[in-house]
Amino acid sequence: MIKKFITSQLLTDKEWNHYIQNLQSAPAANNDAEECDCAAMLRPLILKGMDEEMQEVDTIVNNPEAPTFANTIVALANTGENLERATAVMYNLLSAETDDNLEELASELAPKLSEHSNNIMLNEKLFARVKAVYDAETNKLEGEDKMLLDKTYEGFERSGATLSDEDKQRFREITAQLSEKTLKFSQNVLKETNNFVLHITDENDLAGIPEIHRNAAHHEAEARQLEGWVFTLHAPSFMPFMMYAENREYREKIYRAYNSRCTHNNEYNNFEIVRSIVNLRREVAQILGYKDYADYALRRRMAQNAKNVYQLLNDLIDHYLDHAKQDVAEVEKKAKQIEGADFKLQPWDFSYYSQKLKHELYDYDPDMLRPYFELSQVQKGVLGLATKLYGITFKRNDNLPVYQKDVIAYDVYDKDGAFLAILLVDFFPRESKKGGAWMTNYRDESCNAPPHVKVMPDNSNRPVVSVTTNFTKPTADTPALLTLGEVETFLHEFGHALHGIFAMTHYASLSGTSVYWDFVELPSQFMENY
């Protein structure tokens, strides 16, 4: 299963287009679990991809012709396609379906990939060609061409191309360390999350917890070959426990476990990693001439600088702070009504008594809505909404190999029946998957047509878009029933997915969600709040 999935995602654009055209007539994919050393598959391809990209860069640098937009900027944008595909698979699987070998590979390759990037971005001859085009063409080009030129030139500046030799060397050292430490940080969080279980054997300790969550905890215990019930730090288990469990001691225990991840005296402690990341980021920002890392990061955001961010936050405080204090006071009042005047509200109490107050004031319990949000029906509703709004259709494709048996693949078509994208949806938590929800691409869209020619689906390389969540799992007795919040999360990430699905650009580096990170939330907010 996963081996065939990886192989398919590593195809060249031409091979991929041929592959998906023939999928409908292919037999259904065998997506049962299989033994696969993904790291062993990917390692030689990534190393080879780095060598190939350097050869492509050398060709640009050694081009005897004067630098032009086509032979320098576009040529550079088209380098490293094989490397990009292989690293996309590696990093996406690190988040969605990781294992020890894959994490070891990522740790091994992080400094190598950082050095590879620096060897390109700090190449003086290459930057000279880029700057020559930028100086000559920046006020002449329009649209995507101008965006590609500006983004390329600024990318070199932000990667140290204008620094002194001494600062360039320090920049290399910093970025190598950052690549290792940021990766290690994420790996530690996942492992620490998976390490904790709250194992309950006395049913009295489940008081207050609705049957649906008890059943899920019982199935979790069975999967671990344990008696009783198991609650974890994954959201579908952790959040209901905090909201409903009457056992205050256990609420405190699981709350502290969740909020103290990677702070213990063990191999997963992130204190020094965080301190090092902060200091290294500050140093790299200052080397590049920025006041601090916030200003460096925000230069590529709509907000532009930290001053604008703080102004927005300070303006908002006047509108929400009094209301927030009032909400906390009301919850504390409710808690004292139940527990007595001497009761002191703690962080692990807030969700529990907040839910009690909501039930009293509004007769509202979020679990009351779950039967209306059965996952298969929600999928139909969300995809159907896209059909109604945008005219696109989704056809389930069981012939496409996926990386895990719960993943569902859809072919996406526009209103005229032209192929737009493949959408993968991966809904449920597992130990090999990080928490939260996100959208990503396994393959980016790009167009083979010449610039300024209208892009149509039949002359572009269509993307593979993935929506990954951690929704409540189904059990043998109960289908997957979502909360309203989970439905909103699905719509939010689906908005990001539509941004990728509708992509129609000439250059992959500008495709879909490759926009300012604050602007990228517009399609997701639109779908979430529609």
What are these regions, as identified by a protein language model?
Residues T162-K168, I392-D398, I501-L510:
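Inter-helical turn/loop segments and adjacent helix faces that build the functional surface
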Residues H18-M41, V89-L109, K131-E173, T232-E272, ...:
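Short His/Asp/Glu-rich catalytic/ion-coordination signatures at enzyme active sites or charged loops
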Residues S164, N259, F428, T472, ...:
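Hydrophobic alpha-helix feature that most strongly marks membrane-spanning transmembrane helices
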Residues I60-P64, R396-N399, S524:
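Surface-exposed patches in mature extracellular/periplasmic domains of secreted proteins
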Residues I2-I209:
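N-terminal helix-rich structural modules
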Residues P479-T489, G500-F526:
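Post-HEXXH active-site segment of zinc metalloproteases
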Residues R282-A285, G289, A386, L484-I501, ...:
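Active-site recognition of the HExxH zinc-binding catalytic motif
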Residues E144, L148-L149, Q177-E180, Q187, ...:
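Active-site-proximal, well-structured secondary-structure segments within enzyme catalytic domains
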